């Protein structure tokens, strides 16, 4: 006979004390740390423990007794259900303080290296409509909120277009209005939804892998161009004609779209990197502008999703590099070569390395359209490409700029960097925790000289951080 699980406790009259990772808040109760979503420091609440581990618990609020004086009123109707903007209830100034503290704590606690004074975080001038790309799932199982379930209302149509819910991969939270991007994207998405409802188009079933309408990607640029990519899943005869009719509706309704494309994706996931993207109308790209440069952005291209803050981020990286025009610069994890091309005119030579071959082709095109002839780009796994032999062939780096994924740099990459011993390393990171780990590995040879956090994503717990490392001078 199985033992009955002991009920998890209810904690009453608890005052939230601090902000934690992943957009949660925390409070210490005895020797236990309790993490709570959708609270801010100063809230007084009753908490129901949902998950108990050895040294921490996860809980949710069952009653607000008193709201914090620093609490902000969320501006989005989907806040608290959608997992996107978890900090809308925290004033932006408090968000910046929390991100500054996060960078300091992680560099100090994980890196354990000597740090200079960390520069004040660069906040985003725009805290709404700051993104240039959003992706929406189309699904035949809409997520119902607790209030909707409690109402007992029966929905005849369970189809929805919106965001996936954490912990429920096969369900979609229907989105009426998202504040992350220019409002035209809401009009485009809702128009597609309304057309699909009116014409009884089937929505994708993630478990059964069938249904016509699957996914929508919307991008815009600071040049005023718009790109829309609709993913379909052809199941039966007539689906292609139905898909093309929807595409014509989009083209007729939104002449502002300069790159309208579609995909017939028969895979189990929604990634399009290995799919044929078909142009329905207009171009297969849009352009972003940065200073005097133009960057071509295709349907598969990576480009920083906050254009204005990306410019400030790249300016910091370029300033930290302290280029005079004589340096050989290596740009590791170069993506589509944005940083490489951005610094090229202040360098003698720039070598870019990136894992994704399509991104490298974009990087080469971006050099070509900007008349930049001192860059070279190479595709492959960083730990396999960046070797002592590669450096011997392509020139010793005076400066290395590295912008790795969230996992940070592979230890083999760090070793090659240490062997090359460039004078300066500019480390751009979207994850200060793994950046701190790598700084510790570099510490025997490098000193952290400058630290500049940059907020790319207001109302989220994510923060970018740029660190300048200078090679240490050893006295004999």
Predicted features, each with a name:
Residues 25-30, 162-165, 229-231, 363:
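Short, acidic/hydrophobic/Gly-rich beta-strand patch recurrent on exposed beta strands
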Residues 63-73, 80-202:
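Extended interfacial segments that mediate partner engagement and assembly in macromolecular machines
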Residues 170-214, 234-261:
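Internal alpha/beta scaffold segment
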Residues 42, 181, 306:
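Short, conserved phosphate/pyrophosphate- and ester-handling motifs at nucleotide-, phospho-/glycolipid
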Residues 218, 224-233, 294-298:
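Short, aliphatic-rich beta-strand segments
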Residues 2-13, 18-23, 237-476:
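Rossmann-like S-adenosyl-L-methionine
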Residues 1-78, 376, 384:
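Terminal RNA-binding accessory module
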